[in-house]
Amino acid sequence: MSNKRRYFGTDGVRGKVGQYPITPDFVLKLGWAAGRVLAKQGTKKVIIGKDTRISGYMLESALEAGLAAAGLKATFTGPMPTPAVAYLTQTFRAEAGIVISASHNPYYDNGIKFFSSEGTKLPDDIELAIEAELDKDIECVESSELGKATRLNDAAGRYIEFCKSTFPSTLSLSNLKIVVDCAHGATYHIAPNVFKELGADVIAMGVEPNGININEEVGATDVRALQKRVVEEQAHLGLAFDGDGDRIIMVDHLGNKVDGDQIAYIIARDALRRGELKGGVVGTLMTNLGMENGLKQLGIPFVRAAVGDRYVMEQLLAKGWKIGAENSGHVILLDKVTTGDAIVAALQVLASVVGSDMSLHDLSQGMTLYPQVLENVRFAGENNPLEAQAVLAAVEEVEAELGDKGRVLLRKSGTEPLIRVMVEGEDAELVQSSALKIADAVKASC
């Protein structure tokens, strides 16, 4: 069996709807191939959730048909955050959980990602086994062994109660006014209720999904509307979730953005204060230097993983640590959940706000973010612009200018045809001009 993946990226199979591999025929075969592999594992039962994209209906049907042909039973949750599917997969002792979502991407993209029976990303050997089955012709099981589909009507209620259970029972949100932006995505019917039931005065936005407005100028990838609303409503803070509920970005009462690095810092510092910090914190190559320095001042160990929550998780498991994060808002808290869970992460920050009687603004001041600029350059073709001489020369020149007061990172996106250029350092103007210089070199080499 080849170790090279053809379909699975860093976060499952993803692409533009209607273009290979996100087509009804491929997804049907993917369901069958996954069903063949999973059927050998045990219960022959899977949980299927999705976000609010219009294409979810089509892909859900195709996926279930493939699974049924392989003899697996599917339980549909309807629109449900990705971490909720991971949780429900565990509680129902299902063989796997499947999420139909493209997370923070626009509505015209979609994807399929899998969770193991433990609520974690599928092991590499299972993904490779599924890819091997995709090379075979579909063979339907005997009619008496075909799978069937059922619907889980109380999925949202179950997950809401789980989220609330991660918030200290001695605390309440009754003195907080919170603006909650659900990105017209999978948390729209869940997140506002979690915070309301814990006592908060909730102002909800991004809770009117129509199939094509997911992540559109709302949510964790675009917090401008939330920043404006928090200030207008004189709220204590704002919470922005992405389309599938695994990313969280916060906004303080002054309208300042609080990103994944700052959120992880607040959670780690609070755990240290309570004597409950188990080990250190895992970030990524994109984690701001300010977080690394802030943790160092507290005596908290820190390591960087490759970009992607899969790699953060690998480092956490290898070290036995419990807190990992990406600045984009993926926050993994292994003492509470098995994957990145935006609602649960938000609740831990709110527990710190209430427990310390400090504002989100004040809590986030413990670390100073370095100016950081990210430029995305779209590319196509077989050539690798990262190896182009002009790009290497531009990087070398910028690194010499920054010295030990900044850093440069170039990488290919794991989910889109993009080269990501990141520059950070103490001097904001130098950082901006340096990022543009490298991005121009990448564009010229594409």
UniProtKB/Swiss-Prot annotation:
Family as reported in the entry's similarity comment: Belongs to the phosphohexose mutase family.
SUPFAM superfamilies the UniProt entry points to: Phosphoglucomutase, C-terminal domain, Phosphoglucomutase, first 3 domains
Annotated catalytic residues: 103
MF annotations from Gene Ontology: magnesium ion binding; phosphoglucosamine mutase activity; phosphomannomutase activity
Cross-referenced Pfam families: PGM_PMM_I (PF02878), PGM_PMM_II (PF02879), PGM_PMM_III (PF02880), PGM_PMM_IV (PF00408)
InterPro entries (UniProt xref): A-D-PHexomutase_a/b/a-I, A-D-PHexomutase_a/b/a-I/II/III, A-D-PHexomutase_a/b/a-II, A-D-PHexomutase_a/b/a-III, A-D-PHexomutase_C, A-D-PHexomutase_C_sf, A-D-PHexomutase_CS, Alpha-D-phosphohexomutase_SF
Organism, as annotated: Vibrio parahaemolyticus serotype O3:K6 (strain RIMD 2210633)
Alphabetically ordered keywords of this record: Isomerase, Magnesium, Metal-binding, Phosphoprotein
Phosphoserine, modified sites: 103
Protein name (record): Phosphoglucosamine mutase
